[in-house]
Structures are given as structure tokens and as C-alpha cells.
Amino acid sequence: MARSLKKGPFIDDHLLKKVDEMNEKGEKKVFKTWSRRSTIFPQMIGHTIAVYDGRKHIPVYITEDMVGHKLGEFAPTRTYRGHADKSERSTGLK
């Protein structure tokens, strides 16, 4: 279910402050965040934000197409290693 329009998009205050400070200074350095729940705002375009996936921080470069999505969408938390290969044991037992 989507967030109510009357509430508006959510972003953590510390994240918004950090982005605004970097925009004022004209810096484009990578910074870490644990806030996967924050919505991507237009002020973030061009920045690289390292989003925590539960083990490490994954650098995410923010583009125009990402505005309106959540930061967590671009840092997957699970590693898919594929299905098990066919082995003799699985095919030989009948």
C-alpha cells in the first residue's frame, strides 16, 4: 500500500541535512547511511550514497529516474546463488 498523499514523502532529517550541506559546498563525496526507508528527493541527484544492506554499505549513484523511490530498493539484502544443480543423488533415488 502506498503512503498517503496528505502525509507527503518521508526522508530522515539527518540525511536531508547532509545532502543540503553538500549541495551548498558543491561537494560530491560518498557518505554512508543506514536509512533504507528514506525517499529519494531531487536534491540528491548526482550524489553517491552508501546504503547499508545488513552486512556492508553498497554505493548507489542517484539519477533522475530514481526520484520517488526508496534508497533500500537499490541495495538488495539477499544474495541469490541459484538453484541446486542436478546431482546423482537427486536423480538416482526412486
Swiss-Prot record:
Coiled coil: none annotated. Pfam families: Ribosomal_S19 (PF00203). GO terms for cellular component: cytoplasm; small ribosomal subunit. PROSITE patterns: RIBOSOMAL_S19. SUPFAM superfamilies: Ribosomal protein S19. Keywords: Ribonucleoprotein, Ribosomal protein, RNA-binding, rRNA-binding. GO terms for molecular function: rRNA binding; structural constituent of ribosome. GO terms for biological process: ribosomal small subunit assembly; translation. Protein S19 forms a complex with S13 that binds strongly to the 16S ribosomal RNA. HAMAP family: Ribosomal_uS19. Belongs to the universal ribosomal protein uS19 family. PANTHER family: RIBOSOMAL PROTEIN S19P FAMILY MEMBER (PTHR11880), SMALL RIBOSOMAL SUBUNIT PROTEIN US19M (PTHR11880:SF8). This is Small ribosomal subunit protein uS19. It comes from Desulforamulus reducens (strain ATCC BAA-1160 / DSM 100696 / MI-1) (Desulfotomaculum reducens). The gene is rpsS.
